[in-house]
Amino acid sequence: MAYYGYHRISTKEQHLDRGIIEIKRFCENQKIKLESIFTDKITGKNFDRPRYTVLVEDVLRVGDTLIITELDRLGRNKQEILKQLRFLEEKGVRVMVLELPTTLFDLSQMENNLAKMMIETINNMMIELYASMAQAEMEKKEKRRSEEH
């Protein structure tokens, strides 16, 4: 059971350091041994990203945990985000999103099934909401760019 971080930026104005520091700080505070943080400097429109691909295809194993700071660092396309999260879940990889506190609970350790189902439901609703917001932000930026030309 290993912990890995992932952070993505897409513009020159963004800084990889912010996300890396946030992931490291979280792990230090929680006394989690972080193996490595994978980063990409590329758009979040799709998942054709070199370091993310290595992480998902070659590194992550059953029982591992992937830590990201914000859901939109995973991607900007709602359907692709949800597809990736399902893929990771099926692969047996837990995903922790630091901006979504309910994803920080280790549900496998919960004995109360009702509480577990409630937190899973809240997680799913929050992920749907945040994935929708990430896509809306991408569409707004694309519209602005097209209006500039």
State where each predicted segment sits.
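Short, structured surface patches at the beginning of a domain
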Residues: 1-147
